Amino acid sequence: METFLFTSESVNEGHPDKLCDQISDAVLDACLTQDPDSKVACETCTKTNMVMVFGEITTKADVDYEQIVRKTCREIGFISDDVGLDADHCKVLVNIEQQSPDIAQGVHGHFTKRPEEIGAGDQGHMFGYATDETPELMPLTHVLATKLGAKLTEVRKNGTCPWLRPDGKTQVTIEYRNEGGAMVPERVHTVLISTQHDETVTNDQIAADLKEHVIKPVIPEKYLDENTIFHLNPSGRFVIGGPHGDAGLTGRKIIIDTYGGWGAHGGGAFSGKDPTKVDRSGAYIVRQAAKSIVAAGLARRCLVQVSYAIGVRGALSIFVDSYGTGSIPDKEILEIIKEHFDFRPGMITINLDLKRGGNGRFQKTAAYGHFGRDDPDFTWETVKPLKWEKAQA
C-alpha cells in the first residue's frame, strides 16, 4: 500500500503574528458592534514594548483603539515584560485614516448602493476546501496541529502547566493513503511542539507535561504507535517569546487560518477586514460551498475558487475540483454551486450575517482557525441543504 507524508503547522494566540491578527479583529468587532456598516482595514504590528494599529477605517462608532490593544494583549496573557510584552505599560501607537473616497464610491457608492449592487472591495481570488477525513470536514493534519495549540493555551490559563508562557507553535505530520483522490489518514508520523516557558522548568518536565496534558487529550490513540516521533521543544530553550522574541504583523499566518497547506490559497489575509473585503467574505462563502458539497455526499474532497474585480458586484469566475472523488461530474457540481450560493459581495454579507459584531465574533476567528469550528458565530460553517441536487443525483 503506497502512502505519503503531509504536514500542517499552527501557532497559538500568544504568537506575535497571531497577537496582531486578534487585535485587528478586536478593532473590527468594536466597529461593527456600534456601526454594522463600518468599513475597516486595520493592520497591527508589534515588537518589544510596542504595538501599533494602522490602516483605514470609516465608522460612526466611538472606538478607543488603545484600550482595545491593551485589553486584547492582557487577555492573551501578556501581562509583564518577562512573558514578552506588558499590556499595561507598552507603547501603543495609532495611525488610522478614513477609507479612500475613490474606493468608497466604486464599492458602495458612499453607502448609497443596495446590498445586491455593492461591488467587491478589491480584486482577487479565494479558495474554499473540504474533505471527509474528519467530522469537521477539514484536513486532519490541520485539525490536530490547531487543537494542540488551543490545548497549550488551555492548560496555561487553567494552571495545569504553570510554567507555560503565551507563545507557542505546533506541527503535525500524518501518513496518508490516497483512496481514489480522497485522503485517508493512516497514522501520526511526527508531532512537534515548541512552546515558550519560564526559567524554572526542566526539559524533561516540559516533555512529560506536553505528552500527558496536551498530546494525549488531543490526538486519538488510534493514530499513535511506537514509531511516532515526538519533537518537544527541540531547540532546548524558549524563554524569550512573544513580541520580545519576534516581530509580529497582521496577515502572516494565512495557511494556519485556512487549511494547513491543503487545497489552495489566493494570498489574501482575513483579520481586520470588514465583509466588503472579498479576501474574507469570498473565502467564507467558498468554504461553505465546498463543505456543503462534501456533506451532501457529492464528493469526498472539494475545492472551490471564486474571483472578483474591484467595484464589480458579481463573481468573475467560479471553479470546482473534486479531485476525482465526485459522485457526479465536476461541471454538474459547479452548476449546483451556482444555483445555491450567491457570490455577490453584498449578498454574502447578508446571507452569512457578516455585519454582526459583538461576542468577540471575529476576534475568535483570529486564533485557532477560521474553518472547522463548532460555533454559531461561524455562520459559513453551516452546511447548506442542496435540495435541487438531491433530486438530480
From Swiss-Prot:
Protein name: S-adenosylmethionine synthase 2
Keywords associated with the record: ATP-binding, Cobalt, Cytoplasm, Magnesium, Metal-binding, Nucleotide-binding, One-carbon metabolism, Potassium, Transferase
Cofactor note: Binds 2 divalent ions per subunit. The metal ions interact primarily with the substrate. Can utilize magnesium, manganese or cobalt (in vitro). Binds 1 potassium ion per subunit. The potassium ion interacts primarily with the substrate.
Top EC category: transferase
Tissue occurrence: Roots and shoots.
Catalysed reaction equations from the record: L-methionine + ATP + H2O = S-adenosyl-L-methionine + phosphate + diphosphate
Residues that bind K(+): E43
Biological or metabolic pathway of the protein: Amino-acid biosynthesis; S-adenosyl-L-methionine biosynthesis; S-adenosyl-L-methionine from L-methionine: step 1/1
InterPro entries: ADOMET_SYNTHASE_CS, S-AdoMet_synt_C, S-AdoMet_synt_central, S-AdoMet_synt_N, S-AdoMet_synthetase, S-AdoMet_synthetase_sfam
This protein's encoding gene: SAMS2
GO (cellular component) term, any one: cytoplasm
Entry's EC annotation: 2.5.1.6
